[in-house]
Amino acid sequence: MATGDLQGKYQKLAQEYSKLRAQNQVLKRAVVDEQANGTALKEQLKMKDQSLRKQQQEMDSLTFRNQQLAKRVELLQDELSLMDVKGKKTKKNMDTSQLSQEQKSVFDEDLQKKIEENERLHIQFFEASETHRQMESELTSRLQELETNTAQHQAVVDGLTQKYMDTIEKLQGDKAKLEVKCQALEREAKDCRLRTEDCQNQLKTLHTDLSSRLDDSLVIINEKLPFNDTRTSQLNALNVPVHNKRYQLKARELANQGLSFVRDLVTALLNFHTYTEQRVQIFPIDSAIDVVSPLNKKFSEYLHENASYVRPLEDGMLQLFESITEDTVTVLETAVKLKIFSENFSSYVCFLQKILPYQLKSLEEESEFSSGTSALRSRNQELHKDMQKITAVFDKLKTYITLLALPSTKPEGLLRTNYGTILTQISEALHRLHDISQELSKHYNNKAALEQELPAATDKLKTTNDCVLSSLAALTNVTSKIATFFGNNLDYFISSLSYGPKGGRGFTNPLSAETMLVYKKKAAQYMNNLRKPCPASVPYEEALVNRRVLLSSTESREGLAQQVQQSLEKIGKLEQEKEHWMLEAQLSKIKLEKETLRIAALIKGTEKGQLPEVPHDNALLLDAGEHGKGNSTETKSTSLIGMLTVTIEDLQAPDHDSREELIKNHYMTRIAELTTHLQQADSKAVHLYAECRALAKRLTLSDKSNRSLTEETKYSVQSISKLQDELITTKRSYEDQLSMMSDHLCVMNETLSKQREEIDTLKMANKGNSKKNKMR
């Protein structure tokens, strides 16, 4: 199922990508057209600049020609003045004066013509410069507008390309993830195949074993239980039936599937009635603009109450599903909750019958609407018939479901022989409901297609029609599922009615079912008492591994214990040697002090001139100091604290009290050291106990934090689901924005075509003006 969902999502993403790619191509074409228009306008501007330069050159040439003519006129005037002076002086040359007068008149005429021509050229140049200036200003303003539009379009195209690249990368990543998941699923499929093969082999072995056991048990039953008499059906009705757990599990599974189908049916009916209410508020008269007719107003009020009739269907089916458990017996006589579902279904059918006249009148009102065509009227007639048919089918289903609910409340109200007939009639009615809903969806689709062509059709009406069509498609789908489900399980429903005591006619009332359940509980309790729990065992391979680990650990433990014992013995010996050498050092200190005192006394005696008598012990000490310790005999004294070696000379020494005092001091210091060690050990134990308590507190805190983290993970999962819903909504909004952008691009293309037409008309007008100027 996960791979199917992922493939469906991937296909949706691919479709969205293809749509976005097509829109991107449209945007690119529009941008290319804008760029072409911009280049054409730039070329036109260049041509206008060239024509302006030519006219300026002509103007310069004309001004130069005018200056030349003015100079020539001045020269001619000078010549005329000279000729006049000569004519006054000489009256002889009359003929020449006449000739000069004729030349002067000719020059005057020529000058007048040149002046008129110059004036006409000035006027033409001024008009041409004015028209050119106006054209240049208009074209520059249009060029700026087009450049801004092209920049905007380029920004939109860049943003869309970036978005498409991101979507492509995301799709590629999703594709890689899907490939990895497919590989993992293929591996799991291989493992599952191997497991199924093993399970099939085990099933075969178990089947053979159980079949042999069944044969043996049947032989024993036939031999050992000949007293069971099942000939008289009246007495067999008193038999306690056997509880079939497999039958109950199958019934619960079918009830669960029926509950899911009823939920889908409830959602489809809710959507259909809700969208029908919205359509009545919009067409043929929009409630936001004008007052709706009283018929449609009443019809919309009734449709607004659809949830109170439709949702109880799901509640009744849910109660029926919850009443079917492993510890119950499910037949028509014990299915008490079926009565609730029957009552809810009857109330919904009454609701359909109540709104049917209003729905038919509403269709007639739509047909009488002024903008309705003959085809639309025929579609309304088809819907008129379909609504009557679907209400009749629901009424038929209500009758059969009410009959099925009778055995649980009134067993005498329905004969047991009619159960199978009623179930087959329900199956046929469900198939008929699917066919009628399919025809209704088809006819409504044709009607919606005709209504979209009407001039009075608004966007709100189109979207509402799409919603109604989607709800009808969902209704058709769920009715087909229910019909196929009921048809496939019809044999099971009919065969399950024979579930009852052995040799009997079935359940007559729910008391036998309760008795059977009581005996079942007693039998289960008896078997639990007989069954002794097996001692907990360990698998053989795991036991071998544990034995190896145990042997290795015991060997290592023994070796470590020996090492510890040896190290403890070494430590004891070293401590004894330490004590011995410490006592030796103290005795040597005492001897040194005595020798120093004796030497001091000898020095004093020598100073006085007397040689004191050396005692025997001191002589022996001197001999021992001179000859060494080789001849002296030693005695060893060993205690728990240490070992003490004392020579005979030391024992014979007169200062026993001082030696005992030293030994006492040594032992006291040793006891003090041991007490300090003991106190340190106690403090360490207290510290370890505090650490253990702290660790216990940390463990409790970690448990609390773990619980809080699990709650946070639940909240995070909920937030992830919310974010996924927000992602879906944002995706839909982006799709709407893209559709709006495509519409905007279409409008921009239309405006660009209009601008092209205007530019062409201006070109034609410019050409006509230029021709008129040339004609002038």
Curated annotation (Swiss-Prot):
UniProt keyword RNA-binding, yes or no: yes
Gene Ontology CC annotations of this record: early endosome; membrane
Xref: InterPro entries: PPP1R21, PPP1R21_C, PPP1R21_N, PPP1R21_six_helix
Compartments, record wording: Early endosome
Keyword tags: Coiled coil, Endosome, RNA-binding
Chief location category: other
GO terms, molecular function: RNA binding
Coiled-coil boundaries: 4-206, 432-466, 555-597
Pfam families listed in its UniProt record: KLRAQ (PF10205), PPP1R21_C (PF21636), PPP1R21_helical (PF10212)
Signal sequence range: none
Protein purpose: Component of the FERRY complex (Five-subunit Endosomal Rab5 and RNA/ribosome intermediary). The FERRY complex directly interacts with mRNAs and RAB5A, and functions as a RAB5A effector involved in the localization and the distribution of specific mRNAs most likely by mediating their endosomal transport. The complex recruits mRNAs and ribosomes to early endosomes through direct mRNA-interaction. Putative regulator of protein phosphatase 1 (PP1) activity. May play a role in the endosomal sorting process or in endosome maturation pathway.
Domain writeup: Coiled-coil domains of PPP1R21 are essential for RNA binding.
Subunit description: Component of the FERRY complex.
Name this polypeptide is given: Protein phosphatase 1 regulatory subunit 21
Species this chain originates from: Xenopus laevis (African clawed frog)
